[in-house]
Design a protein with these regions (language model features):
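Conserved class I S-adenosyl-L-methionine
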Residues: 30-40
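A short glycine-rich, Lys/Arg-flanked "PGG" loop and its adjoining helix->strand segment in the class I
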Residues: 107-119
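Core SAM-dependent methyltransferase catalytic element
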Residues: 158-183
Length: 183
């Protein structure tokens, strides 16, 4: 039985993120090896597997990792994103939750994630809904820190998690791994 058959088809895809997902997938080859970081309870993990990608998933919270594993039919590493290592670089990284916007932790984490990617590979994640870091601030941070990532062209995409209010809107950002190593 193919691994994707284990995915519960009854869960509807959260199509409020359809444009972001499509933009991310456009940069990938069929069967690409991806990291689904901070996978939560596995909604994005199931989506990525259903699209035919080989996915390594990690989640720091044991209870969430167990649910994600049950939902997806595959093992999920119980590991904070900052501790992830891989012998072979990934073709892409999709983060299911925002990164911490504190510069003292964000810079080293972005540097770490850059080392996990092949040259030109995408890293896609939601910005914190709190607005603590804007797209412009993130771009400046990446540029001035010498991180081997660059902002990818992607329309400003916001996905509201509530039809009646925009207070829960999530803006996604995509960075691409540069050809040079992080300094």
């Amino acid at each position: 039985m193919p691994h994707s058959d284990a995915i519960a088809a009854s869960r509807p895809l959260n199509d409020q993120h359809a444009h972001v997902r499509t933009t991310f997938m456009a940069r990938l080859k069929p069967g690409a090896h991806l990291l689904n970081g901070q996978c939560g309870m596995g909604e994005d993990l199931c989506w990525l597997r259903a699209e035919g990608y080989v996915v390594t998933a990690c989640e720091a919270v044991l209870a969430d990792a167990k649910v994600a594993s049950q939902q997806s039919g595959q093992a999920v590493r119980v590991c904070p994103l900052a501790k992830m290592h891989s012998v072979l670089p990934y073709d892409g990284i999709w983060l299911s939750r925002p990164l911490d916007s504190d510069v003292s932790t964000l810079v080293p984490l972005l540097q770490q994630l850059a080392t996990l990617l092949k040259a030109g590979a995408p890293l896609c994640f939601p910005l914190p809904p709190s607005g603590k870091i804007s797209l412009a601030q993130l771009q400046q941070l990446v540029t001035t820190s010498g991180i081997a990532l660059q902002l990818a062209p992607m329309e400003a995409v916001s996905a509201s998690t509530s039809d009646s209010s925009n207070q829960h809107a999530t803006q996604y950002v995509m960075l691409l791994r540069g050809d040079h190593q992080a300094t």
